[in-house]
Amino acid sequence: MTGVQTCALPICRPEFKNYSAGIVVQAYLPDAYEFQTELLDFAKARMADGGAPLKMRLVKGCNLEMETVISSLRGWPNPVRTSKTEVDANYLHILERALLPENAKALHVGVASHNLFTIAYAYLLSRKLGSAEYMTFEMLEGMADHVWRAQSQLGNHVILYAPVVKDEHFLNAVSYLVRRMDENTAPDNFLTHSFNLKPGTDTWRFLQNQFEEAYKMKDVITHIPTRTQNRLHRYTPVPPADVMKNEPDTDFDLAQNQEWVRNIFAKWKKSPADSPEIIPLQIGAETVVCEKRHKYMDRCQDDEVCVCEMSQADAGQVMKILEIAEKDPAGWRKTTLQERHKIMYEAANRLGEMRGDLIGCMCAVTGKTVVEGDVEVSEGIDYARFYTTSMKQFAELPDVDIAPKGTILVISPWNFPCAIPIGGIVAGLAGGNTVILKPATVAAPVAWLFAKAFWDAGVPKEALQVVITDREALKVLTTAPAVKHIILTGGTDTAQNIARSNPATPLSAETGGKNAIILTASGDRDHAIMNIVASAFGNAGQKCSACSLLLVERSVYEDKNFQDKLKDAATSMKVGSVWNPGNVVGPMITNKNDKLLKALELEKGESWLVPPRFLDKHKYVLAPTVKWGVRPGNYSFRTELFGPMLSVVCIENLQQGIDLVNSLEYGLTSGLQSLDEGEQKLWKDSIMAGNLYINRGITGAIVNRQPFGGMKLSAFGGGVKAGGPNYCACFVNIADKPGSTTDYTQSYVKAYEQEFAHARDVNNLYGEQNAFRYLPLKNMVLRLFPGDNNEDAKMIALAARICHTPLSISFEPGDDRTAALASLGCPLKEEALAGFLKSMKNYERIRTCGADIPMEMYEEAARIDKYIATAKPVKDGRVELIH
């Protein structure tokens, strides 16, 4: 449906036939001329049918900054014309056609401009053409008052707009005021030069030249829109590159892309008459259909339609899968990084080609909305291109050897069934490892679908195997000696169970989150509400990064206007079946969420700003819910919930809010809504979370733009973020070349200064700053064993000192290192292993000189949720300082 058709729907009703209506046309849009064409056709047809004329208000453009920012963030072409001269020329071109009598009679014209040259041209042209009676001049009160007074003396019809705001709504007007000030002080804006303007001056000639240049261009200017993305067309492959460019999401404003969505629905919305697809079990290059299969029912059709069935592996079949991955019969580990880079780019291109099917599968299997599914596909494509690109910085280090670890097990979640598992498998494959993907069973068909992109791109099926299992067979996977590293995205309890059942196998896990946004009295409340509801209720509140806590400074908390607006924003979100593309909030993955159901009960002092409402008979679809008056310690304050429920807490000031957020066990994402730079600095320097967001939503991290990972119980492993420059280095073995002559002191200092010391923004987007920074560990202990050499200890100690990380060194009785290590300036402690195990809880990280350490250390670290960095130290600081 076109813009004109959308606007025409109400006034096409018979009862409005004799009413006029107006619409704004913005000349800075290349397709404004085509829009005018549609508008003229509609207005003339309406008048021919006896209807009243319509009106077109012609402006230069209202939202240049917003359009530019959105384009920058989404990777879309800027929809506005590239220069003011082009905009002015288009304005004159549209104006000339608008003032033709046969057009102006049906579509009256409002000339909205303060530019004296434009006004004079419109005045003279309308009289020449005889259409002045259908034209009005439109100006703002208080701007160029002398111009409208002169127009009145000429008998022109002038409409003056005077912004009016009530005291209690003044904050709503500030953004309008700022926009006007910004526009009116721009160097090429007419009003900037309008004061004391006189003919013959340099300023006059500058403005005259502006107009004349636009006049010369008006009849030759093109009207081709810049936004031409068309998902109906085949995907345009992107060749391998050394710099990854983020994949643009779908522009759903475009009619052709809306048709594409309808095609997706036609293919993927199954009916009871459709036979469900049977997905086999993959064992290397072979497939087998198992008797035990998981059925996938469409939640948006009341669980009455089976989408597909997927075969589940038993323990014996899992052993075969492990054996194939360990032996690597296809020789994936022997491929070069450049070969893998080329294959990953080809896989990304194939993912781009299957975007529609991936979205359709997510809609049918997991209840994802089209928009949420679309950004997942873009993220998956980004992972496929970024990780081999990021590996190159390590491959180019002159004095290290890099080798794959072996087999990587990737266990992925249901809430991001496309992007996160793709990220995990590419992280493993990029280093030359074989990968076994165990996706969340409830979302596994999505993984089966995207795995085909990798196989077809050149990844051997023996190098990438996809499997779902029962609980017993899963334990075989997670405890197998053949698995050299486990990548998990899932619950904190799952990470703890895996770590404790197999403590010696490295685990990199992104786990739970109890994420909060703090809104202070210095925040832009309208903007904050927009960010809050998007973060809380997107994907039905099931993102691990979702905002489930809102901490509001008392003056805002008690403001009835704020409460009403938050309530209105939550209740205005469209909720329901994902097969309706207008719905923003779809179903939850399960209707057996005991934690959420308990949180939907009120505790003392709590009330509902927006009470819970289930909209379907099986209770998958919960409308956005807002609980008011939640206190620290309440169940919904401290418990991670997967559902569209927001808990609102009153705080006295920002510091109290920071303290409350930091008191939580988790530290995944966190947000601040405040325009006060002092508050921003305090919050940024104090909050304990992996991803921090100021004056924007706290979900939707983008690869390489906002690498993702948390702190505390939100992360297990070395704390290296997914989607960041160091992630792939976790899944390879990096060692000094034999006979390395690197001066590690110089290398560490250089690496610290170039990579680790300063926050940096590698994207440089318009309208958003993304600062990537490294934080030093609070403290670390190095445990030495008799076989460790003192030089390794000195390397680790130097790296810690350069990174400003306090280091203690512990060693066995009888293995006295005091004399050899006294010069390091670290506390030295001679203690038995039993004593050291008791002290491990006091350190943020434990460091060793190798992985061959007592099993008791691994077991204790798993029990107390600590990470042991066991990599042998290397002389290259770009590698060593990561630990």
Regions found by a protein language model. Give the residues of each.
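Positively charged, amphipathic and often flexible ligand-engagement surfaces
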Residues: M1, A8-D242, R845-D852
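ATP-dependent adenylate-forming carboxylate-activation enzymes
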Residues: L437-A453, V466-E472, A521-G523, C650-L654, ...
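Short, well-ordered beta-strand elements within core beta-sheets of diverse protein domains
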Residues: H294, V307-A313, D328-R333, I517-T520, ...
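ALDH superfamily catalytic-core signature
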Residues: A453, G458, A480-P481, H485, ...
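Substrate-binding/gating loop at the entrance of the active-site cleft, primarily
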Residues: P398-A451, N763, G767, Y774-L777, ...
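Hydrophobic face of amphipathic alpha-helices that form TPR/SEL1-like repeat modules
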Residues: P187, S194-E309, K327, G739-Y744, ...
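Extended, hydrophobic alpha-helical segments in both membrane/secreted and soluble proteins
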Residues: M1, A8, A122, I343-M344, ...
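Glycine-rich loop-to-alpha-helix module at the N-terminal edge of alpha/beta enzyme cores
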Residues: E291, K295-Y296, Q301-F394, K681, ...
